[in-house]
Amino acid sequence: MTIEIPAHMHPSRSFQGLILTLHNYWAAYGCVILQPYDMEVGAGTFHPATTLRALGPKRWNAAYVQPSRRPKDGRYGENPNRLQHYYQYQVILKPNPPNLQELYLGSLAAIGVDPLLHDIRFVEDDWESPTLGAWGLGWECWCDGMEVSQFTYFQQVCGIECAPVAGELTYGLERLAMYVQGVDNVYDLNFNGREGADKVTYGDVFLQAEQEYSRHNFEYADTAMLLRHFEDAEAECKALLDAGAPASNDNLPMHKMVFPAYDQCIKASHVFNLLDARGVISVTERQSYILRVRNLAKACGEAFLKTQAGGLAA
């Protein structure tokens, strides 16, 4: 699966070249190469291409980059490897192929990490997302002592059993790029692969935003407004699920509003994360908010199974 790219776009020289190489690798395998979901999410798993498409019996192979926001992880741009906004590369393969680990190692080789030359270890680490009601059997992948990615066999999503089981690969792009480029500070990553006056670094692109969003997340986000937004998103999700529910006299009991409803679930999750970063949610309240988001996700997952994409026969 070798595809020639310009020298300056080699993963060892370019952050965007790393992404392009993974796109080419998984496209050659047969994945649909999707675009990032256009909403604030905490991880690539929240993309409906994973959360919803992991459910039901239909085959689904997809790969995409997903900008991810974790407000509490912001460090005002002062930490060399901790960010409140970062990028994940997500691969979802359903049904799970028997050679998932082999495929993953092949993708590492494609970006210049030869498993024969590096200490590649798989450390058991079962994955769970409380807000999505999801969990799976999983392993962290460590390369020369540093975690670079994780792969998971989904058992449940939205509180619903996955049948068939889907395989998920999640690459931490910044961390992987730091390893491949040999730099210790994420902001020093070469973004475009050029040198001299034409060179653009990760810091050139993102440092100012990281500083400003850290201030926003920890100091300035309006908590009263966010509390209202959470209530609104929760109510709208439920209203859309009710509006799209099949009527009792429908010949085919198909749900008609799953994706708009799931968008509201995503919004509620991000607002919760902002409230958590602002420190206005107690330990007891935190569990309550997580349960409320999980209930929305579960309802969206159940509705998805009543659609053609979810396996309902037309």
Swiss-Prot record:
The lineage of its organism: Bacteria, Pseudomonadati, Pseudomonadota, Alphaproteobacteria, Hyphomicrobiales. InterPro entries: aa-tRNA-synth_II/BPL/LPL, Gly-tRNA-synth_heterodimer, Gly-tRNA_ligase_asu. Pfam families: tRNA-synt_2e (PF02091). Its main location: cytoplasm. The gene is glyQ. It is found in: Cytoplasm. One of its GO terms (cellular component) is cytosol. Keywords: Aminoacyl-tRNA synthetase, ATP-binding, Cytoplasm, Ligase, Nucleotide-binding, Protein biosynthesis. This is Glycine--tRNA ligase alpha subunit. Disulfide bonds: none annotated. NCBIfam families: glyQ, PRK09348.1. Coiled coil: none annotated. CDD domains: GlyRS_alpha_core. GO terms for biological process: glycyl-tRNA aminoacylation. HAMAP family: Gly_tRNA_synth_alpha. GO terms for molecular function: ATP binding; glycine-tRNA ligase activity. It catalyses: tRNA(Gly) + glycine + ATP = glycyl-tRNA(Gly) + AMP + diphosphate. Tetramer of two alpha and two beta subunits. Its EC number is 6.1.1.14. It is an enzyme of class 6 (ligase). Belongs to the class-II aminoacyl-tRNA synthetase family.
